[in-house]
């Protein structure tokens, strides 16, 4: 659902000094489906050559995009994103798990999905117990979710910070003022 070509994301990452990037296109939400073929690996394939040229580690990933609960999750370190397109969300998660993906819950405090509060649902407990949740996004652009930090501490989950950018990066961040994307240090 991004508004820039995948190689542009790699170029942006290089200019910002990042070592790795994952382009996690939505599996279920495809606002440009009339114009773009639904091969969920295509963004990765298009940007591989540029990433290699610039020395950027490109991580194959996709976003499992469901209503709450369970919400939106990224699965990274996939072998093939296409099998994640499943009717039942549990089947999509099990496919990601089968591929050895690292799966994390995106923006649990996003007002579009949880307008009144940030809640941990029974579906999240099930995903966690099934080994289908390894982390939680605690920061997403300007969105900060303190509840998610506590859940990570309580459940020994990885804390993630991401940019979740859909348009050119300079649209969201003013580099001349020292602003930068949210990121995870590894």
Predicted regions and their residues:
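A metal-dependent hydrolase metal-coordination microenvironment
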Residues: 1-102, 106, 131, 138-168
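Homeobox/homeodomain signature
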Residues: 11, 48, 123-126, 174-176
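Catalytic-core segments of hydrolase enzymes
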Residues: 57-58, 137, 180, 185
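Histidine/acidic-residue-rich catalytic or RNA/ligand-binding cores of hydrolases
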Residues: 70-74, 113-122, 146-152, 169-186
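Active-site-proximal segments of metal-dependent phosphoesterases and phosphodiesterases across multiple
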Residues: 110-147
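A structural motif
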Residues: 124-128, 158, 171
